[in-house]
Each structure stands twice: as C-alpha cells, then as structure tokens.
Amino acid sequence: MNFIDEVKIYIKGGNGGNGCVSFHREKFIDRGGPDGGDGGHGGSVIFRSNHHLNTLVNYRYKQHFTAENGKNGQGSNRSGKSGKPLVLDVPIGTQIFSEDGNILLYDFIEDDQSFEIIKGGSGGLGNSHFKTSVNQAPRKRTEGEVAKEMWIHLSLKLLSDVGFVGLPNAGKSTFLSVVTAAKPKIADYPFTTLVPNLGVVYVDDEEFVIADIPGLIEGAHQGHGLGDKFLKHIERCRVLIHLIDGSSNDVVADYNTVRFELESYSDYLKNKIEIICLNKCDVLTDEEIQDKINKLRKVTNKEVFPISTYTNIGVNKIVKLALEVIKNQE
C-alpha cells in the first residue's frame, strides 16, 4: 500500500429538502386546511479518527465527497426524510487545514474523535407553518437550505513517542526491528527506508511508540533526498534517538549534518531531547570506540552511548532511557 500523507479534497454537505404546499383532502370536506410537511435536513460531513488506518490513501483517487440531501416534505404533514451524514475516517494524527493550508481547522490526536466540519442544510418549511387568521389557505413554503461546500487540505503527522534520526544506513531500521515487532525493509545500502515505519516497544508493563523515517542528507530541509518529506512525522515525538554510523570516517561531520537539517526544519525538532548513540560498535576496537565518543562529546556536550543493533549491545539501555524521558514529560 502506498504511504500517502498529503491530500486535497472537496466536501459538501447535503442540501435540505423543500417544504411542501398541500391541503387536507377528505370526503365531504371541500376546503381542508394546509398540511404540507417540512423538508428533511441534509446530511452533515463528519471526520472521524480511526486507529486502524495509517495513511490517507483512501483519498488519493476519490477526491469529491458529498453528503446525502434531505427529502422534500409531503402532504398530510409528512416531513421529508433527513439525509444520512457522511462520515469520513482518517488516521490518528491527521490535521485538517483550509484549502490554502494556512488555517488549522482540527487536529486528531486520539482514536474515535469526531469533527463535524459542515452541517447539513436545514429543511424548508411546509405551508402549514404559514396559516394565519387572515390566510387560511397559504400557498407559501420555503426551500431547503443549500449546504456549504469547500476544498480542504488533509495532512498526516504520525504520532509517536520516540523518533529515529540519522544519515542513511545509520542502522535506524535495524534498531526498530530489534526492539519492536515491526518488519522494515533492511539492507546494507542507503535509503532502504522509503516511508515512515512505526513500532511499539514493550518494557515490562509499559509501552511506547517509535518512528523510523528515511535517512537525512545534507539539504534535506530544502527538499533534497527523502527526509524532508517525512520530518514532520517526528515533530510530535517527545525524544529523538540520534543514531550515528560508528564505521564512518567522520562521525562529527555526520552528527552535525543531521543536527543542521533538524534545526533548519523547525524549532520543534531543534529543541527535542536527544539521545546520541554511536552504532555499529561491533566492528570497532575499544580504542576506536572511545576516540569517536570523545570527539562527539566535545561538540555535543552530551553523553554518547556505544551500541550495536547487530549484536544488540547497549540497545536495551537506550530503550529504558527513552522510556524514562517519556515518563518524565508526562
């Protein structure tokens, strides 16, 4: 299934049904009173979050959605049937924006949230409403209200507690596969991850959600590579795990490249708590590990954790540290 996180769609509420002009007809009664029923209300357009969905692919090919119109009123004071509401399911993390993308209309952050974006048109009034002492046989009725219509922009930002960042092939997908049941595509070449992957990490009786996005390259915040498109998916996370390829010849340059892209993209990412991990330490000597850690500490002023996602060394420690950070922010 394609991962779709941006769509533009047209929505329209159902129009109200028209009121009816009718007069009571009964044997031996020549001039029955007005008995025109009201029109039914049009259906509303409602968005609802659904935890079973993780992409906006349902809106890629069908882009026009209209709720059902209300039925017209009938004689004998029979009101028209109201139109059915149109319920559109979206993944948790979906944001609804105005057509130009400048105004946030709603943000779905929990399962089964509902948002009535367009109310159906009101039904028109039948002629029975217009009977007066001086007008016993009114032929007046009103038409149903025409419902609103609009184009809107849907944007999906995945919800996770932890986000992985790093250059391509730093080992993020391997880390995800080791600590969760997620099965991302993994190989020893850059850009194995082409779409975001989510996994749930279980620690004793607790759990948190972790997100792996395509690796960043220099210029990602300007649209280079794959990372820029998916950086928004880690904006909501509480902590970043920054993986650095320990086999790289210049781990400091690798770290700085990713940090620059994060800081250039948004202040949200710039100010995230960061856990720095030197990965692939299984292919390094103890002296090489310490040398690279010292270099990273010098530029980051932070603790750097040596790990190997291949041999699982140090991984559990990082998982528990991430959980501790998450709990401290609750």
Swiss-Prot record:
Residue ranges that the Swiss-Prot or TrEMBL entry lists as coiled coil: none
Keyword Nucleotide-binding: yes
Keywords recorded for this protein, A-Z: Cytoplasm, GTP-binding, Hydrolase, Magnesium, Metal-binding, Nucleotide-binding
EC number assigned by the record: 3.6.5.-
An annotated GO BP: ribosome biogenesis
UniProt GO molecular function: GTP binding; GTPase activity; magnesium ion binding
Boundaries of every Obg domain copy: 1-159
A Pfam family matched in the record: MMR_HSR1
Domain OBG-type G: 160-327
Cofactors (names): Mg(2+)
Family of this protein: Belongs to the TRAFAC class OBG-HflX-like GTPase superfamily. OBG GTPase family.
NCBIfam families cross-referenced by the UniProt entry: Obg_CgtA, PRK12297.1, PRK12299.1
Assembly mode: Monomer.
Protein name: GTPase Obg
Taxonomic source organism: Rickettsia canadensis (strain McKiel)
